[in-house]
Amino acid sequence: MDRTFVMVKPDGVQRGLVGEVITRFERRGFKLVALKLLWIDRGLAERHYEEHRGKPFFDELVRYITSGPVAAMVLEGREVVTTVREMMGATQPAKALPGTIRGTYGIDVGRNIVHGSDSAASAAREIGLFFADGELIEYERALDPWIYER
C-alpha cells in the first residue's frame, strides 16, 4: 500500500482545522498510520524545505513553518500521493478548486493550510524526517474490505 506525508501547517492548527483535514482523508478511505503534533525547529524546517534553499522566499517559509505547532501525519492507501494532492487543491488558494481543502479554507499562498508530498520519493524522504521507524503503526481496519477489492 502506498504512503504519503501530510502536514497541517501553523495556520491550519491555529484555526482549528486539524480534525477537518483528517476527517476528509479518512472519509475518502485513507488510513492514518502516524500522527503527531510538534513545533518544528529551524534545522528540521530547513531540511524539509531543502529544495527551496536559495530561493527568495526560503527564509520566510522557514520562519513561518517554525512559528507555531504543526500536525504531521502519514496516510496509507492506493494512489494516496496523487489523490491527497488533488484533495488539497492548488498551492495558491485563489487557484484551488472549490471543495478542496485550500479552496475551502486557504487564504494566501503563504497561509495555505496544508502540505502534502508531491511524489512517492518525496513522501519517503519526508516521512523519514518526521517519524522514526517504530512510529508508523501497522494495523488492519475492519472496513478495508469495503474500500479495496482484494
UniProtKB/Swiss-Prot annotation:
Catalysed transformations (reactions): a 2'-deoxyribonucleoside 5'-diphosphate + ATP = a 2'-deoxyribonucleoside 5'-triphosphate + ADP; a ribonucleoside 5'-diphosphate + ATP = a ribonucleoside 5'-triphosphate + ADP
Q: Is-annotated flag, keyword ATP-binding?
A: yes
The signal sequence is none
Q: Where is the active site?
A: 115
Q: What is the required cofactor set for this protein?
A: Mg(2+)
Write the record's keywords in alphabetical order, separated by commas.
ATP-binding, Cytoplasm, Kinase, Magnesium, Metal-binding, Nucleotide metabolism, Nucleotide-binding, Phosphoprotein, Transferase
Keyword Ribosomal protein belongs to the record: no
> Matching CDD domains, A to Z?
NDPk_I (cd04413)
Catalytic activity, EC: 2.7.4.6
**PROSITE patterns tied to this protein:** NDPK_LIKE
Q: Name one GO molecular function term.
A: ATP binding
> What GO CC terms are in its UniProt record?
cytoplasm
SMART domains named in the record? NDK
Domain of life assignment? Bacteria
Where does it live in the cell?
Answer: Cytoplasm
Give me the residues that bind ATP, please: 9, 57, 85, 91, 102, 112
List, alphabetically, the NCBIfam families matched.
Answer: PRK00668.1 (NF001908)
Q: Could you say which protein family the record assigns here?
A: Belongs to the NDK family.
Which proteins does it associate with, and in what oligomeric form?
Homotetramer.
Q: Which HAMAP family match?
A: NDP_kinase (MF_00451)
Q: What does this protein do?
A: Major role in the synthesis of nucleoside triphosphates other than ATP. The ATP gamma phosphate is transferred to the NDP beta phosphate via a ping-pong mechanism, using a phosphorylated active-site intermediate.
* Official protein name in the record: Nucleoside diphosphate kinase
